[in-house]
C-alpha cells in the first residue's frame, strides 16, 4: 500500500476500515500465501475505485470470499475474463497473436485449467458468476469468437493482379510514396494489404542514409492519397473460409493459444461474470504479473 501514498487518506474512510477488517478476517481464515496476495491487490483496487459504488461493492464482496475460492477456479475465472475482455492493437497478425499467447501464458503458467461444471457451480454459489440455463445459450467457439474480436486482421485486401492495385501503386510512385507498403495478405495469399499505420498523421517516410534513419513527415497531398488507399482496404470479411482457415493455422502455432482454444471450446455452459468475479479475476491476474491491465 505504500506505493499508493496519494490514496492513504482512504484509511480515514469508515467503509474502507470495515473492508480492511474483512480482509484481515479472510487472511486469518486462510493458510495460503496466494490468498494474501489476492487480498492485497483487492485492497489496492478498493482504494483506487472507492468512488464507484458497484465496483466498490464487488471488490468488498470479493474480499469476503477469497479464502473460499479454489486456485483452480480463480485461474479459470481470470483466464475467461482476460480472453473475453483484452484485445490487441498490434498492426501485424503474428505480432498480435504472439502478444496474446504471452499474456495467456502468464495466467496458465503451464498449469491445467478447470474443466467440467464443478468449478462453475462453485463460483456461482459464491456469486462470482451467474450460470445460464443449460441448452438455452452457449459461448461462440474460438474459431468464430476470435475473428470477431480481432476483426482488424480480416480486411479483404485487394487482388494482387487487379487494375485497382496497379492504379494505387502508380499513384504512390508518382507522389513519392513507397510501394513496398503493399504486402501479401497473411490470411489470403492472392491479395495485398497495406502495411502502414491506419492513422495517416502517424505515418512518415523513413529513409536509410548511411548509418542513420531519417523520418520525413508526409505532406497534405500524400496524406490524402494514403487515406484514400486505407479506405479502399477497409472492408472486413469475417465469413471468408479462406481467411478463417488460415487464421486458425496461425493460432495453432502458439502453445497457449492452442490450450485456450481447447479449454474455451469445451466450456460446458454459458455464464456471466458478476462484479465480484471481475474483482477476483483482476486481482488474481495482477498477482501473477502486475503489467496485466485491470479491466472492470
Where are these regions (language model features)?
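Glycine-centered, phosphate/nucleic-acid-interacting loop/turn motifs that mediate DNA/RNA or nucleotide
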Residues: 127
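Eukaryotic partner-binding/assembly regions in large regulatory complexes
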Residues: 1-64, 234, 252-255, 268-271
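Short alpha-helical segments that sit at the start of domains
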Residues: 52-92
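Intrinsically disordered, low-complexity segments enriched in Gly and acidic/Ser/Thr residues
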Residues: 221-243
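Glycine-rich, aromatic-bearing surface loops/beta-hairpins
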Residues: 289-296
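Short secondary-structure capping micro-motifs at structural edges
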Residues: 60-66, 106-109, 117-119
Amino acid at each position: 500500500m505504500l506505493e499508493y501514498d496519494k490514496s492513504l487518506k482512504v484509511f480515514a474512510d469508515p467503509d474502507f476500515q470495515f473492508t480492511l477488517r474483512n480482509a484481515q478476517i479472510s487472511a486469518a481464515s486462510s493458510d495460503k500465501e496466494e490468498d494474501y496476495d489476492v487480498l492485497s491487490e483487492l485492497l489496492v483496487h478498493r482504494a483506487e475505485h472507492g468512488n464507484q459504488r458497484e465496483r466498490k461493492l464487488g471488490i468488498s464482496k470479493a474480499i469476503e470470499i477469497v479464502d473460499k475460492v479454489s486456485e483452480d477456479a480463480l485461474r479459470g475465472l481470470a483466464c475467461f475474463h482476460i480472453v473475453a475482455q483484452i484485445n490487441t492493437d498490434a498492426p501485424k497478425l503474428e505480432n498480435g497473436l504472439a502478444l496474446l499467447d504471452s499474456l495467456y501464458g502468464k495466467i496458465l503458467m503451464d498449469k491445467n485449467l478447470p474443466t467440467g461444471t464443478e468449478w462453475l457451480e462453485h463460483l456461482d454459489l459464491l456469486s462470482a458468476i451467474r450460470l445460464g440455463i443449460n441448452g438455452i445459450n452457449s459461448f461462440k467457439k474460438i474459431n468464430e469468437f476470435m475473428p470477431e474480436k480481432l476483426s482488424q486482421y480480416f480486411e479483404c485486401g485487394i487482388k494482387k493482379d487487379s487494375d485497382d492495385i496497379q492504379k494505387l501503386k502508380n499513384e504512390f510512385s508518382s507522389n513519392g510514396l513507397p510501394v513496398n507498403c503493399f504486402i501479401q495478405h497473411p490470411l489470403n495469399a492472392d491479395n495485398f494489404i497495406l502495411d502502414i499505420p491506419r492513422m495517416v498523421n502517424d505515418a512518415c517516410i523513413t529513409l536509410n542514409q548511411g548509418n542513420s534513419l531519417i523520418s520525413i513527415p508526409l505532406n497534405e497531398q500524400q496524406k490524402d492519397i494514403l487515406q484514400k488507399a486505407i479506405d479502399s482496404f477497409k472492408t472486413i470479411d469475417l465469413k471468408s473460409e479462406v481467411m478463417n482457415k488460415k487464421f486458425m493455422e496461425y493460432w495453432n502455432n502458439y502453445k497457449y493459444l492452442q490450450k485456450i482454444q481447447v479449454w474455451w471450446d469445451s466450456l460446458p455452459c454459458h455464464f456471466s461474470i458478476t462484479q465480484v468475479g471481475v474483482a477476483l479475476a483482476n486481482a488474481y491476474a495482477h498477482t501473477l504479473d502486475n503489467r496485466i491491465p485491470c479491466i472492470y
